[in-house]
């Protein structure tokens, strides 16, 4: 009688891998990933959040109205929202969000190294199930993963110390859940 497990589950869940291999993880994974600090002329001084609203599959998108509500809440707390993009459709979405989120910024299209620097210097990153959200977590940035069509147990932010997974298949998180998680992460980051 054999039991099989998908290898991807071990990659995304170091705790599970450790349990199967008979040892205990004493601390969150440290990836050794860093991003060179970078100053962005288009971004004023002060705290900012990166909102990674784009993803490779439309079914994984969080509703624009929810991003707007989140962005307005962050702006009211003095946190500027940055809305990066990679494709023309993502740029259009960033521009639509910009029209409703006070003090938000849509940067020029950024190379991966510049995106990494932007993420690393953020107060918090909130993103859909996308590679950049995982990069933020690996950089050690307080990160909220929003899941609308995938299972965070399989693809979530499991190996980062300051990552929170919200939502699930067919169950996108409410804005209030995301706002509460952002508040907790930012408060724990100040301690």
Explain the meaning of each model-derived region:
Residues 1-191:
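Catalytic machinery of carbohydrate-active enzymes
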């Amino acid at each position: 009688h054999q039991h099989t497990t998908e290898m991807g589950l071990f990659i995304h869940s170091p705790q599970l891998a450790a349990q199967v291999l008979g040892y205990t993880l004493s601390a969150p994974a440290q990836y050794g990933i860093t991003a060179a600090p970078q100053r962005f002329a288009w971004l004023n001084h002060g705290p900012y959040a990166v909102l990674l609203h784009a993803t490779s599959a439309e079914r994984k998108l969080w509703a624009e109205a929810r991003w707007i509500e989140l962005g307005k809440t962050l702006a009211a707390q003095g946190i500027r929202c940055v809305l990066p993009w990679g494709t023309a459709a993502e740029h259009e979405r960033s521009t639509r969000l910009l029209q409703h989120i006070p003090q938000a910024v849509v940067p020029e299209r950024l190379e991966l190294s510049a995106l990494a620097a932007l993420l690393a210097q953020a107060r918090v990153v909130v993103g859909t199930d996308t590679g950049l959200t995982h990069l933020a977590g690996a950089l050690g940035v307080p990160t909220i993963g929003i899941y609308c069509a995938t299972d965070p147990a399989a693809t979530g932010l499991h190996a980062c110390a300051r990552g929170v997974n919200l939502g699930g298949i067919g169950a996108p998180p409410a804005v209030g859940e995301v706002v509460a998680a952002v508040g907790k992460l930012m408060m724990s980051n100040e301690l």
